[in-house]
């Protein structure tokens, strides 16, 4: 398949997923209206904050976490190969690439995109919040996990920044000694 044909194929599947998202969104709005007798007019700020944290956690779970790697790899071409390091130690490496084109390639791209998965996650969280009263417990649980995940991301960023400052200080000290 030529590269132009592959690009056209991917554009087609991207369009299909965009239309599908709009259909799901409109369908969800009609479903909410029929279940609740109308559309919600307001969300308490604390509930919106918890929904945002739940959306953040679902997004990280799908896009980044090791526990869902098996699902992401369903839509990827994975190859294992071994390599010998300079020390003679054998290392097994895994190469993960999207399939050439088609639906699986598009789904792979979607699963690698935190912004894309974030929109789908937000849609699911909001619909569940307004339609299913029991979902509040799940949203709360995901929000707590999201807060923990966010704290970990911030702690990692602070640690990396501190390490960079330490390395810069050591480099300046070395330069002064010369």
Which residues does each PLM region occupy?
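Short, Lys/Arg-rich, polar N-terminal cytosolic tail immediately upstream
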Residues: 1-9
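Long, highly hydrophobic alpha-helical transmembrane signal-anchor segments
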Residues: 8-55, 128-130
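Hydrophobic alpha-helical membrane-embedded segments
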Residues: 45-71
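Alpha-helical transmembrane segments and their membrane-interface exit regions
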Residues: 55-57, 144-153
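Juxtamembrane/interfacial segments flanking transmembrane helices
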Residues: 63-75, 156-164
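Short membrane-interface loop/juxtamembrane segments of multi-pass integral membrane proteins
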Residues: 78-111
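Short, highly charged, low-complexity non-transmembrane loops/tails of multi-pass membrane proteins
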Residues: 79, 161-177
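Hydrophobic, membrane-inserted alpha-helices
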Residues: 119-129
């Amino acid at each position: 398949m030529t590269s132009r044909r592959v690009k056209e194929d991917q554009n087609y599947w991207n369009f299909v997923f965009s239309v599908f998202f709009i259909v799901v969104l409109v369908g969800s709005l009609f479903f909410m209206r029929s279940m609740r007798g109308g559309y919600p007019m307001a969300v308490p700020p604390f509930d919106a904050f918890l929904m945002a944290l739940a959306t953040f956690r679902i997004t990280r779970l799908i896009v980044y976490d090791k526990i869902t790697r098996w699902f992401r790899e369903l839509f990827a071409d994975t190859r294992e190969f071994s390599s010998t390091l300079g020390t003679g130690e054998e290392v097994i490496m895994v190469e993960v690439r999207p399939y050439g084109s088609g639906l699986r390639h598009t789904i792979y791209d979607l699963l690698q995109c935190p912004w894309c998965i974030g929109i789908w996650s937000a849609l699911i969280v909001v619909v569940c919040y307004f339609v299913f009263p029991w979902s509040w417990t799940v949203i709360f649980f995901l929000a707590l996990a999201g807060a923990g995940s966010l704290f970990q991301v911030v702690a990692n960023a602070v640690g990396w920044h501190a390490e960079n400052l330490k390395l810069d200080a050591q480099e300046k000290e070395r330069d002064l000694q010369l």
